[in-house]
């Protein structure tokens, strides 16, 4: 069985997979999470798997934005993103570039390739060598994401809404 299936090795679904989505959401919003309520389950238990396989969470931000995210090992739908704002809703389905704005399907002009691990490591090493800031993410961004992850894990364990502690 994979190392990922062991809590002591991977930390579970939130640190292993959830961090990427939560980091993107916080970046889009431009703010940190303030509180979170999470529900976690293992709906398909196996003796060699001791991590949750389903996580659902709701987080709030200081501006009042609600973040609602579900992570599951039991579907093959890929990514679905919806952002509801004051001027409408954007829905992005999967990696194929199907975009809806207020229910109307829009074409995405080109596929965007995200940088792989090699380019991320190269950027990090170049920034350190040149004494310049990183291009996108910072330690502060990572810390905000992990604070949300840890608070969500605690909420999942206790069944209580948790304050996200930064600092």
Predicted regions and their residues:
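Generic structural signal for secondary-structure transition and capping sites
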Residues: 30-34, 66, 88, 133, ...
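A generic structural signal for residues located within well-ordered alpha-helices
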Residues: 17-20, 116, 140, 144
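Predominantly a Rossmann-like dinucleotide-binding segment in NAD(P)-dependent oxidoreductases
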Residues: 1-47, 159
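A general structural signal for well-ordered alpha-helical segments in protein cores
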Residues: 21-22, 117-125, 149
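NAD(P)-dinucleotide binding in Rossmann-like oxidoreductases
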Residues: 40-54, 60-122, 166
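Active-site rim elements
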Residues: 11-12, 109-112, 132-136
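C-terminal helix-rich "cap/oligomerization" subdomain common to oxidoreductases
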Residues: 126-167
């Amino acid at each position: 069985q994979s190392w990922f299936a062991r809590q002591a090795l991977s930390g579970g679904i939130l640190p292993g997979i959830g961090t990427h989505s939560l980091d993107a959401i916080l970046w889009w919003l431009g703010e940190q999470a303030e509180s979170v309520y999470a529900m976690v389950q293992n709906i398909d238990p196996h003796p060699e798997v001791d991590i949750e396989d389903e996580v659902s969470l709701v987080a709030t931000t200081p501006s009042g934005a609600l973040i609602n995210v579900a992570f599951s090992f039991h579907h093959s739908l890929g990514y679905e993103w919806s952002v509801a704002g004051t001027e409408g809703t954007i829905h992005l389905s999967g990696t194929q570039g199907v975009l809806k704005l207020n229910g109307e399907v829009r074409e995405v002009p080109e596929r965007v390739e995200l940088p792989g691990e090699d380019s991320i490591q190269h950027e990090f090493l170049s920034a350190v060598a040149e004494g310049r800031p990183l291009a996108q993410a910072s330690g502060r961004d990572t810390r905000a994401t992990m604070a949300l992850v840890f608070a969500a894990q605690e909420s999942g364990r206790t069944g209580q809404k948790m304050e996200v502690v930064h600092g």
